[in-house]
Amino acid sequence: AQGYKAILRFAYNHAGLNTSGGESKQWILRHIEQLTPLLNEYIGQIATMQVGFIGAWGEWHTSPLMNDQSAKNAIVSALLRALPAPYCVEMRYPNHKKALTLEQEGSRGRIGYANDYFTAGEHPLAPGNDFVPNTDDYKQITEEVKVNNFYMSGEIPYNEDTEWGLAALITPMKSLR
């Protein structure tokens, strides 16, 4: 695959509308079960997998399941079983990881983070959406990386004409430093 690897995230609602994707815990668990052989067959082309599945874009919001901790526990545990160790999964927010009760607690170190709003704090909406230095989220992540070797990725917001669009507001080189 030319040295490239994919970061996977599955979602039922890709339009980004503030509606549920219609997903259920049982449906998601069945789909993970169906995906497991395929994930294992192509594991060499997969860098990591974001937990996804719930809500708009698989970002764990705008869904009835966003408040169902039992479903979240089961989904993350199923994904950790689906991918062979040491492969990791990624979650968007540290508080989601902290709230998990896993089937195998020893797998917690295989849960990394997908910073879906990487701005290095250069936007007023960054706190709570970005891992901004000196915040609790940032401190938790920096402590975790001292003892765990997990995957972490980031997405710089794209150019759009909304309050979330940042292309004109951020300096990529400053953010990357």
PLM regions and their residue ranges:
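Surface-exposed, active-site-proximal loop segments in enzymatic domains
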Residues: A1, Y12-I28, W57-M66
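An active-site-proximal structural segment forming one wall of the substrate-binding cleft
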Residues: A1-K5, G21-Q50, S70-A82
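Short, flexible loop/turn elements at secondary-structure junctions
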Residues: F10-H14, L39, Q50-G55, Y93-N95
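Catalytic-core regions of glycoside hydrolase
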Residues: T48-G52, E59, S63-R177
